[in-house]
């Protein structure tokens, strides 16, 4: 949790934040962007390198076609205009894990521009503009700790050098840490649906830098911005922005000036710290990459890529609401991942009542998966099993209590619901009126005090009686029928 500076509520109300995000997404190609080396994560250090990765003299880059297609697909998914011609450029700076002394990126002629993402804000929505999406290569990785002989050494792993990235730069349209969180959540969903990246933040497949400034409410001019780096989760991004906004307001309120700089976020302390002065574009001395021709993505190639653009989360939500009659809230939860949405639709198509399937997937199934740390693909209960269980409860064959117990057994035994249902002797909810009346008479006789309370007007006591009947029937009594019979007996 961010440790916010002591800024008064009135001061916070007088200022508004202006936020823009730069998101780097690692593309899920088998080989690097300018050579054939593997992009596999977790291999031994410096095992996936070649003269191109190492920046050796005479090594020439060859552009990976699949990386271009993935980048175009992502750009289309966030509503960008694809530039038919874009140019690679050298971004010059020194860092130990950048062996060439420059990074091949794109500058004034990027692959795509002028996109947008729609996010929920309050009871409505808001469009966040996308300035640009461009292709570039990743740098290597500096490892600063874990050396037994000295803590002052840094090791360099160049396996990541040359891995293909797209950088997605938003317009400064984001007005709060909450909006930043929603933007990143929606962007991650969209990228996952396209399949161009696994957006795994722990492995560095998605990285985010935040540019933030504050200004008096109503002012058009931007304030001086800072860039916050080293933020490796969406929650930390929100916390870092909350702290930095409060810090900047405090500086301005006390008569100081904001320094344009790069700051690091320390999640343990919940604070940002100055790292270095913020570079401007001219500091990188961009110039066109002489070893690569301009990238041409003509209309025919764009149309080929557009054909493989999948149904995206927002469109899928709208279709599922219309097709299955589920609520917008259900649709939102069920489309958070493409895999979950696919699984739900498979079950919904096989069941009589898709709404019941939605409730079971979100409640009984996802709750147990989360408790055991499992993904939907690891569920012992298949979507056919969910559909089967939904139909059993829909028909009244089993009660919700029986369903919960059978789901528990499925997870304990690692078996699908139909198999466990068979093993348990295909239990049925009891709707035998005469048998239930005998149990009800027994329960009322044993609890005369509660019966008098009911007759005196305390109608909620009926829940106690239902529980007792369900207990004696070992959960197999039809609770709706039990309610009816109890009310009739107690009212007589």
Which residues are covered by each model-predicted region?
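Structural motif
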Residues: 13, 325, 348-357, 397-398, ...
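Amphipathic alpha-helical core segments of compact helical bundles
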Residues: 28, 246, 341, 362-370, ...
């Amino acid at each position: 949790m961010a440790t916010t500076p002591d800024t008064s509520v009135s001061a916070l109300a007088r200022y508004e934040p202006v936020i823009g995000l730069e998101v780097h997404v690692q593309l899920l190609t088998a080989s690097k962007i300018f050579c054939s080396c593997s992009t596999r994560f977790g291999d031994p250090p410096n095992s996936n390198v070649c003269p191109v990765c190492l920046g050796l003299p005479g090594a020439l880059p060859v552009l990976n076609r699949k990386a271009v297609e993935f980048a175009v697909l992502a750009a289309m998914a966030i509503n960008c205009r694809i530039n038919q011609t874009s140019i690679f450029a050298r971004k010059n700076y020194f860092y130990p894990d950048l062996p060439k002394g420059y990074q091949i990126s794109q500058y004034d002629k990027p692959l795509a521009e002028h996109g947008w993402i729609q996010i929920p804000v309050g009871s409505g929505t808001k469009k966040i503009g996308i300035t640009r999406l461009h292709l570039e290569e990743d740098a290597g990785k500096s490892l600063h700790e874990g050396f037994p002989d000295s803590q002052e050494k840094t090791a360099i792993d160049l396996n990541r050098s040359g891995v293909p990235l797209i950088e997605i730069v938003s317009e400064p349209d984001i007005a709060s840490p909450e909006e930043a969180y929603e933007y990143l959540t929606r962007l991650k969903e969209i990228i996952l649906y396209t399949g161009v990246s696994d957006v795994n933040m722990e492995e560095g497949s998605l990285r985010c830098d935040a540019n933030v400034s504050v200004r008096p409410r109503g002012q058009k001019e931007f304030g001086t911005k800072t860039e916050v780096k080293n933020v490796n989760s969406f929650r930390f991004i929100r916390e870092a922005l909350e702290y930095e906004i409060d810090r900047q307001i405090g500086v301005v309120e006390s008569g100081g000036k904001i320094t344009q700089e790069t700051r690091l976020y320390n999640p343990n302390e919940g604070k940002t710290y100055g790292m270095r002065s913020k570079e401007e574009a001219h500091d990188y001395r961009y110039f066109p990459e002489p070893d690569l021709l301009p990238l041409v993505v003509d209309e025919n190639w764009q149309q080929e890529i557009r054909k493989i653009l999948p149904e995206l989360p927002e469109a899928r939500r709208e279709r599922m609401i219309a097709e299955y009659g589920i609520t917008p809230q259900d649709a939102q939860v069920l489309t958070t991942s493409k895999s979950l949405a696919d699984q739900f639709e498979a079950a919904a198509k096989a069941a009589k009542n898709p709404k019941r399937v939605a409730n079971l997937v979100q409640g009984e199934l996802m709750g147990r998966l989360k408790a055991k740390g499992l993904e939907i693909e690891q569920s012992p209960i298949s979507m056919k099993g969910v559909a089967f269980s939904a139909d059993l409860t829909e028909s009244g064959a089993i009660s919700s209590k029986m369903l919960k117990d059978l789901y528990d057994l499925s997870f304990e035994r690692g078996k699908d619901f139909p198999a466990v249902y068979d093993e348990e002797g295909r239990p049925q909810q009891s709707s035998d009126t005469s048998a239930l009346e005998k149990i009800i008479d027994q329960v009322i006789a044993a609890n005369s005090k509660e019966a008098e309370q009911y007759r005196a007007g305390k109608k909620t006591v009926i829940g106690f009686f239902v529980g007792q009947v369900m207990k004696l029937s070992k959960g197999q009594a039809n609770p709706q029928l039990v309610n009816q019979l109890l009310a009739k007996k107690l009212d007589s």
